Swiss-Prot record:
Record text on cofactor binding: Binds 1 zinc ion per subunit.
Role description: Catalyzes the attachment of alanine to tRNA(Ala) in a two-step reaction: alanine is first activated by ATP to form Ala-AMP and then transferred to the acceptor end of tRNA(Ala). Also edits incorrectly charged Ser-tRNA(Ala) and Gly-tRNA(Ala) via its editing domain.
The protein's name: Alanine--tRNA ligase
The keyword tRNA-binding is assigned to this record: yes
A single MF term (Gene Ontology): ATP binding
Gene3D superfamilies named among the record's database cross-references: 2.40.30.130, 3.10.310.40, 3.30.54.20, 6.10.250.550, Bira Bifunctional Protein, Domain 2, Threonyl-trna Synthetase, Chain A, domain 2
Record's comment describing the protein's domains: Consists of three domains; the N-terminal catalytic domain, the editing domain and the C-terminal C-Ala domain. The editing domain removes incorrectly charged amino acids, while the C-Ala domain, along with tRNA(Ala), serves as a bridge to cooperatively bring together the editing and aminoacylation centers thus stimulating deacylation of misacylated tRNAs.
Keyword match Amino-acid biosynthesis: no
Required cofactor names: Zn(2+)
Location of this chain's protein in the cell: Cytoplasm
GO biological process, one term: alanyl-tRNA aminoacylation
Organism: Xanthomonas oryzae pv. oryzae (strain KACC10331 / KXO85)
Length: 882
């Protein structure tokens, strides 16, 4: 079969969506690779992920028929194809899944009929090359294929429970141990008897002859805890068809890497690496990985050392290592992005929008890994040369910890050489590091509530959104020295739990409130408020008067001024987050924060330092929102309603069914349980005080607001005026005067270097004349006042040219310290080693040094011992010359 030219990969996407749109389906955009509704899932790995809540009955959509092309990733967690990518015909990290869905609307008859129509009438697949499977008890599906479609029974394969349990089958799908489930029917394409492999269900089914094209899942049961199946009132259809596999069939090629999309990417990789063999496995890896990496960055993931960011880093570094194998030593991977945009930008406009961000992020990671890749490969070669067939876990960990080699990258390299990694040893080394980190992170005073106490308490009712003080607060628990007690007295350090409180407990980056609790004859100074077991507010403080007992009723009031300063900073972090995403890109995600009375600290994902111009724009945008004086709206709503409302949720955070949404005009909408201003104008002024890196892929901004910002600006102005005074001008002249001063300093430095060179030249002439002859070798060992290491090396070079066969030791003394340089030139090089000579001298003056046989340097302390050490050089040389 010669496939018509119209069946390009992009045309297949369009055909699929147009076909189902014409049959009443709503076309739904692809969900991001980062699931927004399932914290248990690392990446979107199938088409049904974005519809999971619909199938579970937790969400309703405005349509009952849908079709989409979903981008998917399988490179981490349970579903991980990374190790196979590049080495097999059909494994990918990133792939596209074509799917059509029915939510209680059509069922088996229409799903089967439409699938067959699209494959055989639109895409013209020969019917005698197709066969299907059904679950062994699904008589309805079997009959539809035989009677409605007309497939001979010989090409309808019944698949039973082949995974060791009832309903555990390749042809029975279930979301979990309980809940929606049902049989599925799969459509296979026969590549022909020239390809090894048997039909599904046969002993040879894993061969490449019969390839699954389309899986139609019929969710018609609700599985109960006891394993019984109860029919669903509204059965659903969930289908999935891999675009790359289908394209291979429609383009009459056997492997996915031969389709038009991959051939274009492989061609670009070939041009960048100079490798002309288009079947080279490394080119395939690079072509596959550029899709996964680019779309992860599009969806807000950046390279880091944890979670999704680390999966991205692993994929990037695997691609870079394959480039290194091909001899590439310069950045190349980021140069693949324009070709990818040409190929997939029409289908995914978000890729076009983010293309510059993607390229910059990849380039930054290329430059970072290039610093250690060569060194790491040398270490691997050394380890491999002394190992038989196993790379020790400790060495794999060293490659990971010191050289940035993800362990699966090390395993990849080992596999290519017929070796494997001792994963147990690697995990032991990792666990030792985790234990060290945990020990370093512990601090005194950490308290955990006993389980029985937690069970007896109700969550604390927080009153602090509306009130700064409250009464009738009943003491429900009391801790002293970390243990529950019934009473405590004046002088005791305690943690007091009340049924209600106006005190905010530290969470979401916002520090806890301080203040006072008081009752008849008792006063507690509250220094901090912490959240215990995620739901109990513990007032941490000291009883300054009286005795406190369980059941006592107290009044409490927070430090209003401290809270007031804190809320300015908290609201400012929301505006800052929005401004960062507007200026730097939507890849920016919050990674941590501190909201205190005196400052705010905001950590976020970004792959490079922020320029001064970018910082200025960010600060200006935040202050513009402050001046606009938006009202701050608070809404309590269901999680899905909040997301539909436009609220931004933080990746990795766990949210309940109902959430609190904070909206500042049209600029910022986030989920937040903290305390905030009522209008953005209350913030007054926002001023960034610093920006820097925290870890790989994470930046940090610190800032101040309100009176703190005014004080900061006033202090900066004072320092500017002081600098102007010292420079003899006014504030507007500081930059010009500093520039002139810097140029003068550079000129004087050049003049000084010139004078030093002349001094060294004169000293060299004198030293050459004073050289001592030791067995035909000229020996010089002298002290030179004021010479630094560079001047000593210059003098050394001149002396070597002047003296020929020689051994030279020069000591430059300045400020109580000595710089040492030793050199060996000509015939004595084999017997006298400069490094050994310098080490001998340095050890006598309390220093150290070393180097090559012909040149070494070091240092030590100035003093009488230096003269003695230098005087002994001729004898040392004589002894070594023999």
């Amino acid at each position: 079969m010669n496939a018509p030219a119209k069946f390009s990969t992009s045309q297949i996407r369009s055909d699929f969506l147009a076909f189902f749109e014409g049959r009443g389906h709503t076309i739904v955009p692809s969900a991001p690779l980062v699931p927004g509704n399932d914290p248990t899932l690392l990446f979107t790995n199938s088409g049904m992920v974005q519809f999971k809540d619909v199938f579970l009955g937790a969400e309703k959509r405005s349509y009952v028929r849908a079709a989409d092309v979903q981008r998917c990733l399988r490179a981490g967690g349970k579903h991980n194809d990374l190790d196979s990518v590049g080495y097999t015909a059909r494994h990918h990290t990133f792939f596209e899944m074509l799917g059509n869905w029915s939510f209680g609307d059509y069922f088996k008859k229409d799903a089967i009929a439409w699938a067959w129509e699209l494959l055989t009438q639109i895409w013209k697949l020969p019917t005698d090359r197709l066969l299907v499977t059904v679950y062994h008890t699904d008589e309805e599906a079997f009959a539809l294929w035989r009677d409605m479609i007309g497939i001979p029974e010989s090409r309808i394969v019944r698949i039973g429970d082949n995974k060791g349990a009832p309903y555990a089958s390749d042809n029975f799908w279930q979301m979990a141990d309980t809940g929606p489930c049902g049989p599925c029917t799969e459509i296979f394409f026969d590549h022909g008897d020239h390809i090894a492999g048997g039909p599904p269900g046969s002993p040879d089914e894993d061969g490449d002859r019969f390839i699954e094209i389309w899986n139609l899942v019929f969710m018609q049961f609700d599985r109960q805890p006891d394993g019984t199946l109860v029919p669903l009132p509204a059965p659903c259809v969930d289908t999935g068809m891999g675009l790359e596999r289908l394209a291979a069939i429609l383009q009459h090629v056997h492997t996915n890497y031969e389709i038009d999309l991959f051939q274009a990417l492989i061609g670009k990789a070939s041009a960048l690496t100079g490798i002309t063999d288009l079947e080279n496995k490394s080119l395939r890896v690079i072509a596959d990985h550029i899709r996964a990496c680019s779309f992860l960055i599009v969806d807000g993931v950046l390279p880091s050392n944890e979670g999704r960011g680390y999966v991205l880093r692993r994929i990037i570094r695997r691609a870079l290592r394959h480039g290194w194998m091909l001899g590439v030593r310069q950045p190349f991977f980021s140069k693949m992005v324009p070709t990818l945009v040409e190929l997939m930008g029409e289908a995914y406009p978000e890729l076009v929008v983010a293309k510059d961000t993607v390229a910059r992020a990849l380039l930054a990671e290329e430059e970072r890994f290039a610093e250690t890749l060569d060194a790491g490969m040398k270490i691997f070669d050394e380890v491999a040369s002394r190992s038989q067939d196993i790379i020790p876990g400790a060495d794999a960990f060293r490659l990971y910890d010191t050289y940035g080699f993800p362990v699966d990258l090390t395993a990849d390299i080992a596999r290519e050489r017929g070796m494997r990694v001792d994963m147990e040893g690697f995990e032991c080394a990792m666990e030792r590091q985790r234990e060290t980190a945990r020990a370093a992170g512990k601090f005194g005073g950490g308290v955990a509530l006993p389980a029985d106490l937690v069970a007896s308490m109700s969550p604390t009712v927080f009153l602090g959104y509306e009130a700064y003080d409250a009464d009738a607060l009943r003491v429900v628990a009391l801790l002293k020295q970390g243990r529950p007690v019934e009473r405590a007295q004046a002088g005791d350090e305690v943690i007091v739990f009340t049924d209600r409180t106006p005190f905010y407990a530290e969470s979401g980056g916002q520090v806890g409130d301080s203040g006072q609790l008081n009752g008849p004859g008792v006063l507690i100074e509250v220094a901090d408020t912490q959240k215990f077991a995620g739901q109990f507010h513990g007032h941490v403080g000291r009883i300054s008067e009286g005795t406190l007992a369980l059941g006592d009723v107290l009044a409490g009031g927070i430090d209003v001024q401290r809270r007031g300063k804190t809320i300015l900073n908290h609201s400012a972090t929301h505006l800052l987050h929005a401004a960062l995403r507007e200026v730097l890109g939507t890849h920016v995600q919050q990674k941590g924060s501190l909201v205190a009375p005196d400052r705010l600290r905001f950590d976020f994902s970004h792959f490079q330092p922020i320029t001064a111009d970018e910082l200025a724009v960010i600060e200006r945008k935040v202050n513009a929102e402050v001046r606009t004086n938006h009202g701050v709206e608070v809404h309590n709503m269901a999680m899905q309603e909040a997301l539909d409302f436009g609220a931004m949720a933080l990746f990795g955070e766990k949210y309940g069914e109902n959430v609190r949404v904070l909206k500042m005009g049209g600029y910022s909408t986030e989920l937040c349980g903290g305390t905030h201003v009522t209008r953005t104008g209350d913030i007054g002024l926002f001023k960034i005080t610093s920006e820097g890196g925290v870890s790989s892929g994470v930046r940090r901004i610190e800032a101040v607001t309100g009176q703190g910002a005014l004080d900061y600006v006033a202090d900066e102005e004072r320092r500017l005026l002081e600098a102007a005074h010292l420079l003899g001008g006014n504030a507007t002249e500081v930059v010009d005067k500093v520039r002139a001063l810097t140029e003068r300093q550079k000129r004087l430095q050049r003049e000084l270097e010139s004078l030093k060179a002349k001094l060294a030249s004169g000293a060299t002439a004198d030293l050459g004349a004073a050289a001592i002859d030791v067995a035909g070798v000229k020996v010089v060992a002298v002290r030179l006042e004021g010479f630094d290491a560079k001047a000593l090396r210059d003098a050394m070079d001149r002396l070597k040219q002047q003296l020929g066969d020689s051994v030279i030791v020069l000591a430059g003394a300045s400020g109580g310290k000595v710089a040492l340089v030793s050199g060996v030139n000509g015939s004595p090089t084999g017997k006298v080693k400069a490094g050994e000579l310098l080490s001998n001298i340095a050890s006598q003056i309390g220093g150290k040094g070393g180097g090559r046989p012909d040149l070494a340097q070091g240092g030590g302390e100035d003093g009488p011992a230096l003269a003695t050490a230098l005087d002994g050089v001729p004898l040392w040389v004589k002894q070594h010359l023999g």
